[in-house]
Amino acid sequence: MALTPTAVANSALSKRDTVLLTSLQTNYGAINTSPVFETVRRVSGGTIKKVNYTQSGEIVAGYNPQNQVQSGIDLTCAFETEASKQTIKYLIEALYAEDTSYTNTASTFASLVNGFTVPAATYAALSAGDGFWVNGFANTLISGFYFVASKSGGTTIATTIAPVATEAAGASVTIKSNKHLNSNDPYYRTFQTATTDLSTVSDVSRHTVYDAIPNTGSVSIPEEGAVTGSFEYMAEREVSGYEAIAGQTVTAAPTDLVVSAVDGVKAFYVNGLSATCIMKSMDVSISLAQAGDNAAACGKRYSRGTPEFTGSAVLRALRDAPFTWRNYAHGGTRVSVACRMSHGGADETVIVFTRCVVTEATPDLDADIVTTSASFSAELDPTLGYSVGVFTNWTV
């Protein structure tokens, strides 16, 4: 006899009954016409409306409580993720990043003892400090990621880490460098929290906010487990009621792999050189200090304050040079810090803090295995012209 499922008229709500949707706005001040939403891959979080009150000064007779007067409304969307391409996209938005994409395929690339010979167009497209990927050399070990150290002669690019071998031009080689550098390009989003609610006509209750601008963003690389992200957007407007937007549709959620600290984090770099197996973990944070501007009969508007780009790391203290980071901190030495992550297949992301002051680096000399806990704060690199960059070989 076939099993017949039990009918349940009113089961308890689960976290799986809620989805967070988002759509990047074409124009400030308006939700896109017939918006196409993407599901936010999240661990927790959603849209929040907080109505603030202040106590009235009017005296109420009879020893009753004083009235509460509405003093403001805060609209936010905060969520936590396990790192994916989507996480990287939100981090780029938190940087107000300027976006430049470059790809070239040619047979005139050559591998040198300290870098590459490249076509004139590639030479012009890349700058010192840029990250790029090459693929297609006959010696497959040459393929991979590199930082530009310097340029010379119109066709020669020196790299911070030399290729493993030299190879003359001839193979069809592809170079990719999609640059996302902190700048002044705003990214406003619409967010919608949609939750099962059988009391509504559509069986779904939706809270939609828009003109939402990033306020904070972070990525955390642990020693093991999943890389995670955390983001907060400040919204200026909301949709009245709890129904869907006219014509809205939802695309399938992205399916790229969550980045693992074990096999998804590929490398750490300090000053463009490998720090893999020295750096154990790393956190990076973006804070934009969005300040709310209130006005009577009008919703709150937000404007960026002074941004802070900070991070921390835990490092092994090896006997041949256990106090490198302590010396950075004591000497005020500026360093660049970066990590490289894989999203599965050939798709990778590199996050770079170009010029950092090491604000603290304390070795735990009482431990059986000594490590150094370090903190750093980014500042403008006057040579490169930016503070934080995200490089990808895939299209954001």
Regions found by a protein language model. Give the residues of each.
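Signature of extracytoplasmic/envelope-associated structural regions
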Residues: 2-396
